[in-house]
Amino acid sequence: MKKIVILSDTHGNLSAIYSIYDILLESDMVFHLGDHYDDMNEFEGVLGDKLYRVYGNCDFGRDPKEILVDVEGVKIFATHGDLYGVKRTATRLIERAKGLGANAVFYGHTHCAEIKEIDGITVINPGSAERYSTNKSF
């Protein structure tokens, strides 16, 4: 089983990323789900090809906005979430995941951590590592 770290909405809070530096190094995969994509630039060298990133709404029109990754036969759809209106409902996000044949969805944008299952799809939002967020994060 792979050890996966999921980050989102770091918004320049590099100290939050450094606080889990050892965990990042020990992991098999690291996903950053946007806002601010560039926060992970200085970790690229040590994480190499185990770093997967998508751009968020604060990353100003860059791509990719979403990726589909196969992890030991499990298809993971990773996106920031803003394109799917996730602050209101997860309906469009789940429909996209189904269309891609995904078993799991990783998304951010809401700054609210959650893990749930919808229509047989595991849905994970890690919350925000942003220093001023009052919402819980994993």
For each feature predicted by the language model, list its residue ranges.
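Generic detector of short, locally flexible boundary/turn motifs and exposed helical patches
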Residues: 15-19, 32-47, 70-71, 87-91, ...
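Short glycine/proline-enriched coil/turn segments at helix->beta-strand junctions
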Residues: 25-29, 46-50, 74, 101-102, ...
